[in-house]
Swiss-Prot record:
Protein name (Swiss-Prot/TrEMBL): C-X-C chemokine receptor type 1
Family: Belongs to the G-protein coupled receptor 1 family.
Residues in the signal sequence: none
Species of the source: Mus musculus
Topology of the protein relative to the lipid bilayer: Multi-pass membrane protein
Glycosylation sites: 22
Listed GO CC annotations: plasma membrane
Top-level taxonomy: Eukaryota, Metazoa, Chordata, Craniata, Vertebrata
Length: 351
């Protein structure tokens, strides 16, 4: 999720890295390029404040989700396991935001080791979070449409599913960590960037392709199909609880699309521009640069919205959280009598 910066190579026999080292978006290719004046990004201080706020809310919200789920070991459901892993992914992603915020103001001042670590952590949890959302949609489809409730088997299998997601996310993220480094290009500040000489463009095109396919298109298609079939099933029923679940499912898909679809569409446009599949003009480059800046903010904010969508709107979650507070003497136990729910449904009822 890098901000696009465009510089022009006017000397094909010159130093490639000096000309292109400061580019963090898709590299242009060829011998000569039309000189484009990059539109400077304003309000960087406001962006830092926003990143800090998102990081704080994500740390707090996802920590509470983890606390509630880990506190109830005996009644933990398959859905709880997915939500727990999703909370871990969002929490780890939020740890990278302070580094990204500082880099917006001062460039990359943390050196190569942290460049690799932050890149790995950010991409790793970006992939795992999206893939977990897709798995949640499949689980809800099976639970509601096909009413599969072999809990013992599902609890056993879900652990392997989550391990598989983490493993695939690690494989997809490793190239970012291996090839990125703190690099100070000619007449510019230090950046955290892949530096492979003339192979940089092809390499980044490959990474972009992986991100488009595994980081958005396949998970989005899975969610739309599974939630679409689930909603169709719910429309045929008249059960109050299932209609409540339908509303939450709609909110989940809507928030995901609002946060992630704009950024991924702009990123796809940037990829097509770098591959010369769409006309390359200075105005278009600057428009994409500004759009990446704005939509990236939406994408990052999704990490702090997940706890609200997946937990805090659930009656069971609120009851379990109050129960923890009551057990530690922080609230009166009489409060729980007004919020008593069926414990065996766990967090599943909110889906």
């Amino acid at each position: 999720m890098a901000e696009a910066e465009y510089f022009i190579w006017t000397n094909p026999e010159g130093d490639f890295e000096k000309e292109f080292g400061n580019i963090t978006g898709m590299l242009p290719t060829g011998d000569y390029f039309i000189p484009c004046k990059r539109v400077p990004i304003t309000n960087r201080q406001a962006l830092v404040v926003f990143y800090a706020l998102v990081s704080l809310l994500s740390l707090l919200g996802n920590s509470l989700v983890m606390l509630v789920i880990l506190y109830r070991r005996r009644t933990r459901s398959v859905m709880d396991v997915y939500v727990l892993n999703l909370a871990i992914a969002d929490l780890l992603f939020s740890l990278t935001l302070p580094f990204l915020a500082v880099s917006k103001l001062k460039g990359w001042i943390f050196g190569t080791p942290l460049c690799k670590m932050v890149s790995l952590l950010k991409e790793f949890n970006f992939f795992s979070g999206i893939l977990l959302l897709a798995c949640i949609s499949v689980d809800r489809y099976l639970a509601i449409v096909h009413a599969t409730r072999t809990l013992a088997r599902k609890r056993y299998l879900v652990k392997f599913v989550c391990v598989g997601i983490w493993g695939l996310s690690l494989i997809l993220s490793l190239p970012f960590a291996i090839f990125r480094q703190a690099y100070k290009p000619f007449r510019s500040g230090t950046v955290c960037y892949e530096v492979l000489g003339e192979a940089t463009t092809d390499f980044r095109m490959t990474l972009r392709g992986l991100s488009h396919i595994f980081g958005f298109l396949l998970p989005l298609l899975t969610m739309l199909v599974c939630y679409g079939l689930t909603l169709r099933m719910l429309f045929k029923t008249h059960m109050r609880q299932k209609h409540r679940a339908m509303g939450v499912i709609f909110a989940v898909v809507l928030v995901f699309l609002l946060c992630c679809l704009p950024y991924n569409l702009v990123l796809l446009s940037d990829t097509l521009l770098g591959a010369h599949l769409i006309e390359d003009t200075c105005e278009r480059r600057n428009d994409i640069d500004q759009a990446l800046y704005i939509t990236e903010i939406l994408g990052f904010s999704h990490s702090c919205l997940n706890p609200i969508i997946y937990a805090f709107v659930g009656q069971n979650f609120r009851h379990e959280f109050l129960k923890i507070l009551a057990n530690h003497g922080l609230v009166r136990k009489e409060v729980l009598t007004h919020r008593r729910v069926a414990f065996h449904t766990s967090l599943t009822a909110i889906y």
